[in-house]
Amino acid sequence: MNDLLTLRVEKLLWRGRGLARPDSGKAVMIEPGVLPGESIAARVLADHKDYTRAESVEILAPSALRRPHPCPHAADCGGSRFGVLAPEASARIKADMLRDTASRSLEPDVLAGLRVIPAPRGWRYRWRGQIHVRNGRPHAMGHASNDLAPLTDCHLLSPPLAADMENLARSLPDGRFTIAASPATEETFTERGRGGLILPIPDFDLDLRVPPGTFFQANWELNQTLIREVVAALDGFGRVADLFSGAGNFALPLARRGKTVLAVEGSSAAARCGADNARRLGLAQAEFRGANLARPASWEPVRHFLPQAAVLDPPRTGAKDIGAALMSISSLRRLVWVSCDVVNTLRDARPLLRAGWRISDLVLLDMFPGTWHMEVIMVLDRPDA
């Protein structure tokens, strides 16, 4: 299909795709890379019954918000499409995307009360990232393709990680790998490396120590705000379940504040890491368990724990059927749901919302500037709480 359309982008949808409504009436969904208000020439990729899918081939009239992308690899790399926006504009557009996406699930007053926390820096914020290695050199995935583009720098990576990226790649075979740097020491690692990263959480006078391949929040600076928000939302609740806990990003600060915490994590290695951190820090009130919460039997210890509240931070794919499992815990009064994909979260939270659980706070953190991704906190209270 080589048909070209002249379109005006009405708004951005989830995942950064543009929406246009030409005179024909059928909606056109445009691949990421456009901004609201822009006029574009677009190539049709597929024509479906209810909508047409297209990609921009030329920006005819750019948005006033568009600015030059600072990265020399931007034309080939698909990892930072929002890099043409200033951080403040990026946060506003993400808030609009969130409100639009959630409008079919959440009440208008909840969306009107959305709090937006911008990123403290727009670039050089990631202390963990992924690279594709080919012939000992770092590469990035191309725009909506499996093509690999060579990298000499990445503006998303923290300075020590970006500076050592090429050296780290030389130690790896072909494939996709996680690389990371310690915010405390700036020492760099590949996921195959020995040693460990020190991840300070200064507001709670503690640090996490994790092996190089362990997941942690890449934007460690804004993660401090995320932790503060979660801990504040759980003020007044003494017994807290931390579900999908990782190595203790929330469990250990909560324990430091005197909570009794049961942390449940699907990765047994991450759960052991969390337990090791708790012992090292003298936080005996934090218990870590390795268990797959997709299995009904894994919920028995959680129910037996009698949590008054829970924080959950599931993977991007969500946690199917978790709503029913949570509602089966009669002691629960509050949920603090941390989400990196609100579409999946709203799907999973639907049983709770239908049962009358109410959202008392909704927060967007621009955890991933330069990209369409965001982190969202949703606080839900039991209707009879």
Report each predicted region and the residues it spans.
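Hydrophobic beta-strand signal
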Residues: A41-R43, Q130, A241
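Short acidic-glycine loop/turn motifs at beta-strand connectors
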Residues: D23-S24, H48, V133-R137, H143-S145, ...
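Rossmann-like S-adenosyl-L-methionine
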Residues: D3-R8, W14, S171, S182-A385
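Terminal RNA-binding accessory module
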Residues: M1-H73, S145, F288-R289
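Residue-level signal for inorganic ion chemistry
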Residues: A20, G37, S80, D341, ...
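Solvent-exposed residues in well-ordered beta-strands and their adjoining turns
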Residues: L45-D47, I59-L60, H132-R134, P211, ...
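Extended interfacial segments that mediate partner engagement and assembly in macromolecular machines
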Residues: V57-H69, A75-D174
